[in-house]
UniProtKB/Swiss-Prot annotation:
Involved in the final reduction of the elongation cycle of fatty acid synthesis (FAS II). Catalyzes the reduction of a carbon-carbon double bond in an enoyl moiety that is covalently linked to an acyl carrier protein (ACP). Belongs to the TER reductase family. This is Enoyl-[acyl-carrier-protein] reductase [NADH] 1. It is an enzyme of class 1 (oxidoreductase).
Amino acid sequence: MIIKPKIRGFICTTAHPVGCEENVKEQIAYTKAQGPIANAPKRVLVVGSSSGYGLSSRIAAAFGGDAATIGVFFEKPSTEKKPGTAGWYNSAAFDKLAKEEGLYSKSLNGDAFSHEAKQKTIDLIKADLGQIDMVVYSLASPVRKMPETGEVVRSSLKPMGETYTATAVDTNKDVLIEASIEPATEQEIADTVTVMGGQDWELWINALSEAGVLADGCKTVAYSYIGTEITWPIYWHGALGKAKMDLDRAASELNNKLSATGGSANVAVLKSVVTQASSAIPVMPLYIAMVFKKMREEGVHEGCMQQIYRMFTQRLYKADGTAPEVDEENRLRLDDWELREDIQKHCRDLWSSVTNENLFEVADYQEYKDEFIKLFGFGIDSIDYDIDVNTLIEFDVESI
């Protein structure tokens, strides 16, 4: 099949298997070039391992620390007539490349919120690894099917209290728009906490703990974003922020539990990056285009892989074995460079002066678009997209 990008709204409905593999290879090459991770965990579970920060975490563990990895995700495999999702191809590429290096890699595809996912993961750990010493929780799902009732709960990307209006960019037409979003209802806020908060992370860790598959000293980390006053109304001060605060609550509970056996639980606050998740949040594409340009100029720009490698080597698994620096909420802060005052002042000053005419000049908007399409395996110079490719990629994955 010849595969071209098809964009609908803020998602690309096609993915290119060769391009996705190239993306994974690029992240592996970066990790290897940085050198091995000292004190790295050797048996790692990544819940939400098929794209973004979750995929980079699996790569860091495997190719930076020689870890055996189990990945859990919810992706669509390819059919004769339709390509699979980018996450399917990313995971297939990871599996192939890990096995080429003699690394253990197994994957489970299905609803990570379900009891079945947790039980199948436990069974796999018991059968193959015995125990695990790191759990990365990196789910980014807009809906959660409640395991007890089957009820489907949906999250909302809305402000709280009052309607939020701000400059945003229509990424299909490449023009600035005024985006207005009605405030979330109390029910929508509660539902967002249910979907994107810390409940399921707790359920995972408690299930793994009760099954006896967490090794002494096991660390767990879940990913969050706080951002700045530019994005706060829709993010940290919105319904999503309430969910991320619940993640902090869960981290505290889990840290108390795991510290009894020498382990830890932390939220890691990461920088803004181009992901399928962030592209859905109004204001984020424009903010990302601005902040990326300034961070590149300052020499502190990072993508997912760079961030996660820094989290492993300079926070959780430092070469000297010392405890990681944390903020007052016991979070690992990897957004420190993005939040530098000079970088944020630049974005604040620029916000009111950006126009349709200067959008591509004052912000890295073209780079934003390029990175977005690259998530799905497109726009990579070394690939000829007019060549017929095999879409039916199989690998060591079990359906939940």
